[in-house]
Swiss-Prot record:
Belongs to the ClpS family. Binds to the N-terminal domain of the chaperone ClpA. GO terms for biological process: protein catabolic process; proteolysis. It comes from the Bacteria. This is ATP-dependent Clp protease adapter protein ClpS. It comes from Acinetobacter baylyi (strain ATCC 33305 / BD413 / ADP1). Involved in the modulation of the specificity of the ClpAP-mediated ATP-dependent protein degradation. InterPro entries: ClpS (IPR022935), ClpS_core (IPR003769), Ribosomal_bL12_C/ClpS-like (IPR014719). Pfam families: ClpS (PF02617).
Length: 107
């Protein structure tokens, strides 16, 4: 049989697929904004409860908010940052405080 076809490939060609390039998600800072009515102790409570800061860390962030007008409570991917900001805003309202929390893109 002169024209038989073989199941074996003619050349050894190796195709190597590149692993997908995974990028880290963009990060957002959860920022507390100063106001003239929310007690400092309440801000510290928020920072401990929602951002797992110890008393010293929470106090430092609270003082930054108080003296500079805003302070970063934590940095997270967008979904988590939005959730934390919403939780803080809802809790502050439920306790009768005007504290505002927002997210900002992290540089």
């Amino acid at each position: 049989m002169g024209d038989s076809q073989s199941d074996e490939p003619e050349g050894d060609i190796a195709v190597q697929t590149a692993p997908p390039e995974l990028k880290r998600p963009p990060l957002y800072a959860v920022v507390l904004l100063n106001d003239d009515y929310t007690p400092m102790d309440f801000v510290i409570e928020i920072l401990q409860q929602y951002f797992a800061l110890n008393l010293d860390q929470a106090t430092q962030v609270m003082l930054t908010v108080h003296y500079e007008g805003k302070g970063v409570a934590g940095v997270y991917p967008r979904d988590i940052a939005e959730t934390k900001a919403n939780q803080v805003n809802n809790y502050a309202r439920s306790q009768g405080h005007p504290l505002l929390c927002q997210i900002e893109p992290k540089d």
